[in-house]
């Protein structure tokens, strides 16, 4: 019988099948193989004894939080209160993309901007769209509802960015108040935190920490450049160009010619050297 692990507490694994939820245990062979079942794992279970027999190959695996097989991550990014931070956004995009997860940028609190601020932010919003990212603002939530059906979705962003508002728009029946996400999805405010998937109208949500908790690993730094969609790596003189100070670098040329947003490039350099 096939299923997906939606909760892990101690050595007990809650597996959602097509028919029901089953409380399962893991075979010792996984420990001997150095393999630990994770929330999000697609598994084969012994229908009679409720043991996990096999863990299917993972499409991705995050270390913090410990979760596997995320399809999409909604990056809820505030434009005001708290103010927009391009570095936090770009760092999250890199982290998500490098883990084979599709990022969707959700710009929140657009309605709080002045006309002058909207002009400035429209340029930035359109830039991200034009280089190939899926982008929505807080007047377009209905666009993603159908797209998310059946997917495992992470929801992340700064504190106060508007995650509750986003969930309310996607699933109005939740009627969330600010900071009530965990409670409404089934997790009490004062319970021990653990990663868990919640089925909300056919969308599996995983509650994740904010931007600061998702850090880049040192070994990933060589691949950071591939997460910047607009970087033309093939145009550089050297195949292993890092786009920092090499001669014949097409990316540096594109920045100087304003084909690449300078703030994006500066954020890239900061991530590479930090």
Predicted regions and their residues:
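Structural detector for short beta-strands of small beta-barrel domains
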Residues: 1-9
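Helix-rich effector regions associated with P-loop NTPase G domains
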Residues: 11, 34-43, 47-49, 56-73, ...
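Short, glycine-rich nucleotide/cofactor-binding loops
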Residues: 77-86
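Beta-strand/loop nucleic-acid-binding surfaces
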Residues: 21-37
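Canonical P-loop GTPase G-domain recognition
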Residues: 112-161
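SH3/SH3-like beta-barrel fold
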Residues: 13-17, 24, 45, 52
């Amino acid at each position: 019988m096939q299923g997906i692990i939606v909760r892990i507490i101690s050595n007990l694994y809650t597996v959602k099948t097509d028919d029901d939820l089953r409380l399962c245990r893991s075979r010792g062979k996984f420990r001997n193989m150095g393999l630990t079942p994770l929330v999000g794992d697609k598994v084969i279970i012994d229908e009679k004894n409720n043991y996990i027999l096999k863990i299917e190959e993972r499409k991705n695996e995050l270390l913090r939080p410990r979760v596997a097989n995320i399809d999409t991550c909604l990056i809820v990014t505030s434009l005001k209160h708290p103010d927009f931070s391009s570095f936090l956004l770009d760092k999250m995009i890199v982290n998500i993309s490098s883990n084979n997860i599709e990022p969707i940028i959700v710009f929140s609190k657009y309605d709080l901007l002045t006309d002058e601020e909207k002009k400035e932010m429209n340029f930035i919003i359109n830039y991200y769209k034009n280089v190939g990212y899926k982008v929505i603002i807080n007047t377009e939530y209905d666009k993603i509802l159908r797209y998310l059906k059946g997917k495992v979705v992470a929801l992340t962003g700064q504190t106060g960015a508007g995650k509750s508002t986003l969930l309310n728009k996607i699933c109005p029946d939740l009627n969330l108040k600010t900071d009530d996400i965990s409670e409404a999805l089934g997790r009490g405010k004062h319970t021990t935190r653990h990663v868990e998937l919640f089925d909300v109208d056919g969308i599996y949500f995983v509650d994740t920490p904010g931007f600061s908790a998702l850090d880049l690993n040192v070994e990933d730094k060589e691949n950071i450049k591939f997460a910047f969609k607009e970087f033309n790596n093939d145009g550089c003189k050297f195949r292993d160009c890092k786009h920092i100070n090499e001669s014949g670098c097409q990316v540096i040329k594109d920045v100087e010619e304003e084909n690449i947003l300078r703030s994006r490039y500066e954020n890239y350099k900061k991530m590479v050297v930090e």
